[in-house]
């Protein structure tokens, strides 16, 4: 296949008159449906992974299970640059997505196998019985000797499945977003903006279906059934994307932007050192702006080996990276939604819900995440159809960087609200505890309804509408055409760093020297820990970063305004 294959491109003007998606609805619909199913599978894994590993027969501690989930989510983002490179240099975006969905499906098979007793015994061996000590409950003499952290059962098989799924998710994540935008990019920035809105809407619809149905089945029916359903979702997503090949706009791989980027950076650094050694000879090369001369020396017109376009693309990337760096604390807080927020949920009073059987069912702790997703489903159409058009007509539509800053403010408020709630929960635990069984595990909860967590989830949902959507839009629109997959991969790469930072901080505060989360109690109880300190620490880090981000964003907007006249035609 040579060049770009674009079905139904005959009459662009007529299509534009009929609507920005005219002639592209089948392609966009296939992308959105595949993403919806993929997200349903992803949240089917992550929503109750802490509960799955925290319960019998695995009996991982709450902090251990939370760290595993944070590491998994970090991998799904850190692997994105590799997925972008694979698409750009070897396979093309469409084939890379198909391959990653196949790998995704292979990894998903591990979870129903771990949930089934016979296959679990084959993979992990027979369990060794251990005495569980309830160290968090009061003793008559006020003393209790807690055991050290127990070995994590089935850890190799669990992490193998998580790694395979993580690599599949990473490659899909890096490519499906720009691939979907490719279907409408010739229709202008308005089509791209609207696609990203509906793309994010599909992500959250998949999340709601997964959290509302799959999480309920996992907690109250069976983890085996609850993990078979997301496995089937990945299989259907693979078939949908395979069948959509006839209507997709596809492009062959045209070289890796990452390869060019590293070659240019290496050459520029070497030439800078050589130029500094010759600086006393009166050449005056580095008497100009060092930032420009550093990369301009790579151009053929300046005696370098690289074309003008490639050097300019790398210069554009270097200007974008500080924004991605500033988003790391945002993602660190964001990923608490499915880890420490869930751990907090399990230690609040969770109501029972009616069922058609005589078995008592409890409200899935993961359902709180739906407040975030439902809010996004409701507000994105409102934003797309009403708010944005009104702001645009009056010239008040904020830039993507300004929207990211607003999102940072709301996520800071979310972490702060979680810390306040945890402080109150610990006060109530000292007075009275409630024993509640969730997923086969007994938790000693505070007599405080789980609904008090709604504000922190709502605040994260509002932050997503501003920061996450604007971040995707910024990564795609600020990227040169030759580096769109690469920059999208870097966007997710720095998101993954945020998840790893959260895992690292959680491990750090679990050290006995700090003692915030160092209590090894009945596989997950946090009543003798100080989780609120962790939440307040996250809020403080994000608040300080917000101030720095405002400086970075203002500087970037000014630089963009200076160069926009010459490069706007290559950006969306």
Swiss-Prot record:
Q: Which reaction does it catalyse?
A: L-histidine(out) + n H(+)(out) = L-histidine(in) + n H(+)(in); L-alanyl-gamma-D-glutamyl-meso-2,6-diaminopimelate(out) + n H(+)(out) = L-alanyl-gamma-D-glutamyl-meso-2,6-diaminopimelate(in) + n H(+)(in); glycylglycylglycine(out) + n H(+)(out) = glycylglycylglycine(in) + n H(+)(in); N-acetyl-D-muramoyl-L-alanyl-D-isoglutamine(out) + n H(+)(out) = N-acetyl-D-muramoyl-L-alanyl-D-isoglutamine(in) + n H(+)(in)
Which molecular function GO terms apply here? dipeptide transmembrane transporter activity; L-histidine transmembrane transporter activity; peptide:proton symporter activity; peptidoglycan transmembrane transporter activity
| Pfam families xref list | PTR2 (PF00854)
Q: Where are the transmembrane segments?
A: 40-60, 67-87, 96-116, 159-179, 195-215, 223-243, 317-337, 362-382, 404-424, 458-478, 489-509, 534-554
Keyword Magnesium part of the UniProt annotation: no
Tell me how this protein sits in the membrane.
Answer: Multi-pass membrane protein
A GO BP term, please?
Answer: positive regulation of toll-like receptor 8 signaling pathway
Q: What does this protein do?
A: Proton-coupled amino-acid transporter that mediates the transmembrane transport of L-histidine and some di- and tripeptides from inside the lysosome to the cytosol, and plays a key role in innate immune response. Able to transport a variety of di- and tripeptides, including carnosine and some peptidoglycans. Transporter activity is pH-dependent and maximized in the acidic lysosomal environment.
**What protein does this entry describe?**
Solute carrier family 15 member 4
Q: Which organism is it from?
A: Rattus norvegicus (Rat)
């Amino acid at each position: 296949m040579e060049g770009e294959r674009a079905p139904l491109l005959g009459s662009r003007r007529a299509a534009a008159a009929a609507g920005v998606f005219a002639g592209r609805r089948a392609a966009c619909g296939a992308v959105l449906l595949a993403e919806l199913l993929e997200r349903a599978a992803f949240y089917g894994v992550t929503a109750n992974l802490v509960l799955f590993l925290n319960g019998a027969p695995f009996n991982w501690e709450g902090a251990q299970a939370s760290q595993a989930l944070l590491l998994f989510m970090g991998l799904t983002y850190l692997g994105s640059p590799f997925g972008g490179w694979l698409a750009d240099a070897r396979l093309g975006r469409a084939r890379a997505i198909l391959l990653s969905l196949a790998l995704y499906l292979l990894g998903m098979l591990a979870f129903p196998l771990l949930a089934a007793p016979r296959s679990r015994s084959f993979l992990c061996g027979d369990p060794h019985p251990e005495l569980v000590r309830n160290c968090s409950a009061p003793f008559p003499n006020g003393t209790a000797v807690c055991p050290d952290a127990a070995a994590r059962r089935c850890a190799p098989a669990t992490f193998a499945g998580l790694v395979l799924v993580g690599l599949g998710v990473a490659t899909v994540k890096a490519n499906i977003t720009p691939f979907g935008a490719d279907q409408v990019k010739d229709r202008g920035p308005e089509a791209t903006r609207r696609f990203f809105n509906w793309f994010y809407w599909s992500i959250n619809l998949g999340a709601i279906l997964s959290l509302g149905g799959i999480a309920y089945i996992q907690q109250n029916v069976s983890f085996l059934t609850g993990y078979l359903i997301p496995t089937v979702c990945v299989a259907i997503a693979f078939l949908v994307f395979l069948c959509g090949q006839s209507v997709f706009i596809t492009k062959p791989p045209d070289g890796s932007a990452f390869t060019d980027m590293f070659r240019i950076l290496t050459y520029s650094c070497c030439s800078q050192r050589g130029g500094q050694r010759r600086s006393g000879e009166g050449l005056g090369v580095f008497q100009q702006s060092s930032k420009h001369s550093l990369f301009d020396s790579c151009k053929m017109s300046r005696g370098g080996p690289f074309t003008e376009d490639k050097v300019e693309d790398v210069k554009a990337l270097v200007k974008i990276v500080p924004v991605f760096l500033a988003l790391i604390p945002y993602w660190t807080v964001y990923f608490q939604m499915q880890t420490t927020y869930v751990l907090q949920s399990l230690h609040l009073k969770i109501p029972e819900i009616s069922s058609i059987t005589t078995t008592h069912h409890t409200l899935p702790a993961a359902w709180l995440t739906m407040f975030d997703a439902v809010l996004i489903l409701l507000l994105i159409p409102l934003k797309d159809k009403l708010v944005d058009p009104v702001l645009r007509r009056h010239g008040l539509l904020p830039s993507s960087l300004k929207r990211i800053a607003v999102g940072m403010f709301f996520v800071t408020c979310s972490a702060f609200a979680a810390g306040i709630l945890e402080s109150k929960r610990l006060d109530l635990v000292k007075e009275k505890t409630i024993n509640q069984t969730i997923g086969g595990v007994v938790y000693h909860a505070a007599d405080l309804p789980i609904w008090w967590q709604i504000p922190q989830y709502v605040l994260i949902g509002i932050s997503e509408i501003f920061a996450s959507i604007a971040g995707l839009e910024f990564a795609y629109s600020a990227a040169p055409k030759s580096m769109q997959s690469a920059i999208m991969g870097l966007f997710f790469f720095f998101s993954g760093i945020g998840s790893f930072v959260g895992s690292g901080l959680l491990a750090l505060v679990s050290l006995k020297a700090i003692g915030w989360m160092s209590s090894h109690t009945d596989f997950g109880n946090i009543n003798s820990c100080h989780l609120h300190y962790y939440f307040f620490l996250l809020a403080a880090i994000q608040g300080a970063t917000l101030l720095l981000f405002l400086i970075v964003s203002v500087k970037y907007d000014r630089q963009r305004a200076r160069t926009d006249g010459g490069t706007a035609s290559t950006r969306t």
